[in-house]
Amino acid sequence: MERAEGGTMAERALELDKVRAGYGETVVLEDIRLALGASETVSVIGRNGVGKTTLLATIMGHTTLHGGRVSLHGKDISGIATYRRVTEGLGYAPQEREIFPSLTLRENLEVAARPGPWTMATVFDLFPRLAERADNRGNQLSGGEQQMLAIGRALISNPTVLLMDEPSEGLAPVIVEELARAVKSLTQASGLATILVEQNSRLALDIAPRAVVMDRGRIVYDGPSETLAQDPAKLDRLIGVGRK
């Protein structure tokens, strides 16, 4: 398997070493080895059910770890609670768009805020649409606005590693394009290490210079996005298009 190295040991923001994980006794991930350099952006693609969301859940501490280690900036975080992983520097925008529906958009950001470069103003600069809706409650926002808010909430906690799970899911194409432009701008300029899980392979390969393909709970490709973008047949083989 082709494999890209995510920086030197001193530069690695996040590392999964021989990780085996799942839910209870059910193992979903096998022998996951992934290193993410500081300021590096990686997309994770693959069919539904291959373990992409479980990968992020394992990094956040939501799964049962059956083997291996998860390290953040060289520190083993495998045995610590999720809330402590957040204080150590993980930011997470989950697939479920976890926001407080009865709070205003502004209040949703305020409760997640921690000191650092990301503030209400910088989130609004990234997502101007949110500034226009700042005083609307969470349950009054569209799906696209809720997704932008979920990412904004993760950012305003001022992480060093940002995890995003399926940000384009269920959104209209015009909103997907708007969101993609913002996410690409974010990953290029923020200095954050970022893992983007995305079902839309074309979108993922455009945003992230490095791609990871998963199949049946394992990483089957880790290398340049450009290689896959230029060879759709190879991407289809890796993902398992047409396989029953």
For each feature predicted by the language model, list its residue ranges.
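The feature captures the beta-strand-to-loop junction immediately N-terminal to the Walker
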Residues: 45-47
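Helix-to-loop junction immediately C-terminal to a conserved catalytic motif
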Residues: 60
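ABC ATPase C-loop
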Residues: 154-155
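Helical segment within the ABC ATPase nucleotide-binding domain
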Residues: 177-191
